[in-house]
Amino acid sequence: MKVILLERVEGTGVLGDVVTVKDGFARNFLLPRHKALRANSANLKSFEVQRAEIEARNVKNREAAGKSGEGLDGKQYVMIRQAGESGQLYGSVAGRDVADAIKAEGGKVDRSMIVLDKPIKTLGVHEVKVKLHAEVTVTVTLNIARSQDEADRQARGENVVAAQFEEDRAAEAEAASDMAAGGAGSFEGDHYES
């Protein structure tokens, strides 16, 4: 299906381009979201008449997105989640969770603006892209931890899961050396009289 793009669509074209796309893409994505018009003669004439207005509106929206993006770009958000000892989350962090964390601190984003290739399933510091406009994308940092103390340690660059693993290993080694030093089967106070 031939369509006229009303804004920049990644991988398809920019404002004003007449492009041929698959029918499903046009019907299910571009047309319902007002990102394109069917490329018939009436719409082509109408678009040419309104082109300056549409371009001005697009520039205005891009500038507004750029201003809101200045406050978000590079900002770090802490998310406290439950996780196992290996650092694997019980559940995952999806786009909705990221949007909620940003909104909680005063950001104006929608979950459809969050760009995640796949849900986040591990503790640590993760970078996430937020697409505020077709031409404005910012990066925010998510610090996912089990507690605020852990989040602070991760923010300083410490790998909390590796540190926990080393602490556990040291404790096991100490317990093993205590057992070896005490001797097997000689426990004081285990004397029973009959």
Curated annotation (Swiss-Prot):
Keyword Ribonucleoprotein applies: yes
| InterPro entries the record matches | Ribosomal_bL9 (IPR000244), Ribosomal_bL9/RNase_H1_N (IPR009027), Ribosomal_bL9_bac/chp (IPR020594), Ribosomal_bL9_C (IPR020069), Ribosomal_bL9_C_sf (IPR036791), Ribosomal_bL9_N (IPR020070), Ribosomal_bL9_N_sf (IPR036935)
Identify the stretch(es) annotated as Disordered.
167-194
Q: Which HAMAP family match?
A: Ribosomal_bL9 (MF_00503)
Gene3D superfamilies on file:
Ribosomal protein L9, C-terminal domain (3.10.430.100), Ribosomal protein L9, N-terminal domain (3.40.5.10)
What the protein does? Binds to the 23S rRNA.
- Family, similarity comment: Belongs to the bacterial ribosomal protein bL9 family.
Protein name per its UniProtKB record? Large ribosomal subunit protein bL9
* Entry superkingdom: Bacteria
The answer to whether the entry has keyword Membrane is no
